[in-house]
UniProtKB/Swiss-Prot annotation:
This is Anthranilate synthase component 1. Pathway: Amino-acid biosynthesis; L-tryptophan biosynthesis; L-tryptophan from chorismate: step 1/5. Chorismate binds at G328, T329, Y443, R463, G477, A478, G479. It comes from Streptomyces coelicolor (strain ATCC BAA-471 / A3(2) / M145). PANTHER family: AMINOBENZOATE/ANTHRANILATE SYNTHASE, ANTHRANILATE SYNTHASE COMPONENT 1. The lineage of its organism: Bacteria, Bacillati, Actinomycetota, Actinomycetes, Kitasatosporales. It catalyses: chorismate + L-glutamine = anthranilate + pyruvate + L-glutamate + H(+). It comes from the Bacteria. Its EC number is 4.1.3.27.
Length: 511
């Protein structure tokens, strides 16, 4: 990707092509008075920093993150919605909606090298801001690992999205669910614009939220309960049939028996024509499978990445970096007693425990390459986390970045996740390229953001739907080890796909 983003096309508040109305003098002055930091304070900060975050409070409790995204991002425009939905009580504090982000053009080279150029040297500290207040949002596809290691690619190309894609986002709507505030934010860059120019962007964002009609699809109708037919695979085309997948599992076990790897994560893709709007897919996925990482990334031109990932790949705040592997799976059961029995079964399963410990060790090694010696610690080990359709064993690994290393170095070291590739990672990926018929694309990669100040938070791209060329694609995998049962591993791919299949069926039924 290039290090300079082109100017975004102008739009009117409805999202149609046209010129943007400039605030008149009175409106501009009122907006400046409502903006924090105020003009004089921002000028003082601008003398010391490259970027000054500005914000206004938006007073309209009828706007939600989902409706704001639908209002601000037309069906063929670039935009994003990032949320965290709690799965077991509590409040997930922030949701972010990007307004008119600028796509970064791909260069064909190392995507992380290009991303580093978008980090500001210094971002002004402004009290009371959310953690992410602008930067770059996007994904690294699984095959982007070829820029970091000498790796082969599977023969077939993935569905029609670029290998990696990022959007430069200076203008945001931020929902603070703890304080029930909505903030309109922009990054003021004093070297290339005036304070009034930055405030004018907030004014246009305010207008767009107030004047755009709410989409009919978000009428508040209750969502019907899912049925077994919702997550069936009838009408879907698989890139590996059950027989083909189980045959690949047998071949993976042969590699493991030969000492080539300890674990190999094999996946299969399901595809079908899409007869619903991508925004409705996200709405239904959010309802059926709330997850710590929820995202709808629109690349424009009818291309979307919509997901509900449970798993952190890398998060870096200051010098502290974390990864959180999930490995070991059981389906959820509606009967609490049976659900508890499945949890006990998961905790006692020696195969699942051994697989999980192996992947925790892989995470420790990944962080160890970029952290100070002796700082890598396992904060918690093998807790059970429940999601709507499955439960997983979860652990958290933490370290302190070494001098001269940054968050993007940690992302490079951990990418792709061992939980989506195997161990040892490089050899497992070589075997995956041999056994899977197509490149994975987004699946198994990572999606998240790099803040202008360096804050980095990337989830593993799983439980993720790709929309391209009028089709929707879902993909799920299973970790193959020496004693894997091929039929059980196939069933695991179905369990992991259920939430996405349900979201598609329900969105189409409501269309």
């Amino acid at each position: 990707m290039t290090t300079h983003a082109a100017e975004a096309p102008t739009t009117d508040p409805q999202g149609a092509p046209g010129s943007q109305k400039t605030p008149d003098a009175t409106e501009a002055e009122e907006a400046a008075r409502a903006t924090v930091p105020h003009r004089a304070a921002a000028a003082a900060l601008a003398r010391e920093h490259d970027v000054v975050p500005l914000h206004q409070e938006f007073l309209d409790d009828s706007v939600s993150p989902v409706t704001a995204f639908a209002q601000l991002c037309g069906p063929d425009e670039a935009g994003f919605l990032l949320e965290s939905v709690p799965v077991s009580g509590g409040v997930a504090r922030y949701s972010y909606v990007g307004h008119r982000p600028v796509p970064l053009e791909p260069t064909g080279g190392d995507p992380l090298t290009a991303l580093r150029s978008h980090l500001a040297r210094s971002v002004a500290p402004v009290p009371g801001l959310p953690p992410f207040h602008g930067g770059v949002v996007g994904y690294l596809g699984y095959e982007a690992a070829r820029h970091f290691e000498d790796l082969p690619l599977a023969a077939g190309p993935p569905p029609g999205l670029p290998e990696s894609a990022f959007l430069a986002a200076d203008d945001l709507v931020v929902f603070d669910h703890a304080t029930r505030r909505v903030l309109l934010m922009t990054l003021y860059r004093p070297a290339r614009e005036s304070y009034d120019d930055a405030v004018a962007r907030i004014v246009r964002l305010n207008r767009a939220l107030r004047r755009a009609p709410a989409p009919a699809a978000f009428s508040g109708r209750p969502l019907a309960a899912a049925t077994p037919a919702d997550h069936g695979t009838q009408g879907w085309t698989a890139n590996l049939t059950e027989a083909q997948f189980t045959e690949r599992v047998a071949r993976a076990r042969e590699h493991i028996a030969a000492g080539d790897a300890f674990q190999i994560v094999l996946s299969r893709r399901l595809s079908r024509p899409l007869r619903a709007r991508p925004t409705d897919l996200y709405r239904h996925l959010r309802a059926t499978n709330p997850s710590p990482y929820m995202y709808h990334l629109s690349l424009g031109g009818g291309r979307h990445v919509i997901g509900a990932s449970p798993e952190l790949l890398v998060k870096a705040e200051g010098r502290t970096v974390r990864t959180r592997p999930l490995a070991g799976t059981r389906p959820r059961h509606p009967d609490p007693a049976e659900d508890l029995r499945l949890e006990r079964e998961l905790r006692a399963d020696e195969k699942e425990r051994a697989e999980h410990v192996m992947l925790v060790d892989l995470g420790r090694n990944d962080l160890g390459r970029v952290t100070e010696p002796g700082t890598v610690r396992v904060e918690r080990l093998m807790r059970v986390e429940r999601f709507s359709h499955v439960m997983h064993l979860s652990s958290t690994v933490r370290g302190r970045l070494a001098e001269g290393r940054d968050a993007l170095d940690a992302l490079r070291s951990a990418f792709p996740a061992g939980t989506l590739s195997g161990a040892p990672k490089i050899r497992a990926m070589e075997i995956i390229a041999e056994l899977e018929p197509e490149q994975r694309g987004v699946y198994g990669g990572a999606l998240g953001f790099v803040g202008a100040d360096g804050l980095t938070d990337f989830a593993i791209a799983l439980r993720t739907m790709v929309v391209a060329d009028g089709h929707v694609h879902v993909q799920a995998g299973a970790g193959i080890v020496a004693d894997s049962d091929p039929a059980a591993e196939f069933r695991e791919t179905l369990h992991k796909s259920r939430a996405m299949l349900t979201a598609v069926r329900r969105a189409e039924a409501a269309a």
